[in-house]
């Protein structure tokens, strides 16, 4: 059962001291501020992150023009259960039933010569992008964005601090060469009329575009438009989260809950139905295939520890639930 979060408060934290600063005092202060929301709503906004948000939004908006159902741009790379790509690719909408469409891509370091690729290890794939001549720089910018977020401490700073607070050593850091991290570009379209069959209904009667779920990740770094549609489940019921067009929304994934017996739980969240054109760009931070997830005893009380597993095993199991 998901853990009900104590609040829906989402503070904004300046993470520039952790990224660019050398003075240890503001760096410690910034890290400490990111710990509190992990025990509150499970979310916080990261400001002063150094990413060119306008360029990112322009890149994201380009995908909207390419997802027109009359275009074959994405269709040639679409995901289906019969091909070898089980993560990367275009997930098509289903007219009249499913309106949301998305594009997922993985670590650009996964080339044909990568050891995991040669071994045929699941969840390791070479990215397939739309035609570069028709869409110049689209694939290159996407892979640049993946590298910037995963290789820097933009997202790792929060995860590392949360792990240390709960008692874990810092031996399982994310490496650019092996991370299983993924980016999803999710389009919620405006439609007139909007098909009723595509709208879900929550137990409380709220109309939804995406039902409640936990993120199977270390943490999730989200860039989204300022359309208010995200909610978190709290002890006081479902509460709406604030929006920001400039800052990244960061939340705990199930990884931290697994290691800490939910001392740092993954927040249960959902997307309300809003008939408005919008894009959501979550970056799911993952460790490498062979990183060992060893739960630790601090802050677990008398609860039984979860078994130690490799991150690859944990992630693959999470995808099959």
From Swiss-Prot:
EC identifiers of the protein: 1.21.3.1
Gene3D superfamilies (alphabetical): B-lactam Antibiotic, Isopenicillin N Synthase, Chain (2.60.120.330)
Keyword terms, alphabetized: Antibiotic biosynthesis, Iron, Metal-binding, Oxidoreductase, Vitamin C
InterPro entries according to UniProt: IPNS-like_FE2OG_OXY, IPNS-like_sf, Iron_ascorbate_oxido_reductase, Isopenicillin-N_synth_CS, Oxoglu/Fe-dep_dioxygenase_dom
Pathway(s) the chain acts in: Antibiotic biosynthesis; penicillin G biosynthesis; penicillin G from L-alpha-aminoadipate and L-cysteine and L-valine: step 2/3
Domain Fe2OG dioxygenase: 179-287
Positions annotated to bind N-[(5S)-5-amino-5-carboxypentanoyl]-L-cysteinyl-D-valine: 87, 91, 188, 213, 215, 280
Reaction(s) the record says it catalyses: N-[(5S)-5-amino-5-carboxypentanoyl]-L-cysteinyl-D-valine + O2 = isopenicillin N + 2 H2O
Binding site for 2-oxoglutarate: 278
Function: Removes, in the presence of oxygen, 4 hydrogen atoms from delta-L-(alpha-aminoadipyl)-L-cysteinyl-D-valine (ACV) to form the azetidinone and thiazolidine rings of isopenicillin.
Protein name in UniProt: Isopenicillin N synthase
Organism: Streptantibioticus cattleyicolor
Gene: pcbC
């Amino acid at each position: 059962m998901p853990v009900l979060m104590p609040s829906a408060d989402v503070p904004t934290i300046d993470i520039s001291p952790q990224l660019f600063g050398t003075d240890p005092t503001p760096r410690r202060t910034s890290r400490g501020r990111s710990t509190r929301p992990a025990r509150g709503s499970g979310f916080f906004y990261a400001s002063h992150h150094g990413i060119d948000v306008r360029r990112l939004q322009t890149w994201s908006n380009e995908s909207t023009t390419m997802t027109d159902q009359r275009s074959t741009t994405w269709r040639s790379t679409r995901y289906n259960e019969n091909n070898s790509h089980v993560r990367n690719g275009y997930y098509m909408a289903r007219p009249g039933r499913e309106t949301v469409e998305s594009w997922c891509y993985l670590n650009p370091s996964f080339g044909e010569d990568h050891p995991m690729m040669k071994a045929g290890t699941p969840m390791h794939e070479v990215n397939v992008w739309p035609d570069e001549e028709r869409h110049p720089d689209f694939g290159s910018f996407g892979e640049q964005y993946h590298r910037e977020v995963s290789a820097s401490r933009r997202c790792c700073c929060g995860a590392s601090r949360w792990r240390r607070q709960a008692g874990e050593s810092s031996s399982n850091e994310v490496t650019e060469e092996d991370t299983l991290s993924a980016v999803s570009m999710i389009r919620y379209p405006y439609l007139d009329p909007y098909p009723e069959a595509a709208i879900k209904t929550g137990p409380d009667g709220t109309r939804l575009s995406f039902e409640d779920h936990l993120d199977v990740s270390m943490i999730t770094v989200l860039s989204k438009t300022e359309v208010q549609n995200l909610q978190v489940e709290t002890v006081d019921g479902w509460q709406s989260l604030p929006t920001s067009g400039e800052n990244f929304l960061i939340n705990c994934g199930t990884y931290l809950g697994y290691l800490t017996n939910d001392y740092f739980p993954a927040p249960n969240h959902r997307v309300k139905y809003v008939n408005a054109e919008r894009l959501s760009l979550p970056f799911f931070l993952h460790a490498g295939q062979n990183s060992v997830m060893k739960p630790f005893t601090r802050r677990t009380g008398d609860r039984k520890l979860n078994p130690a597993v490799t991150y690859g095993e944990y992630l693959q199991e999470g995808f099959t639930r």
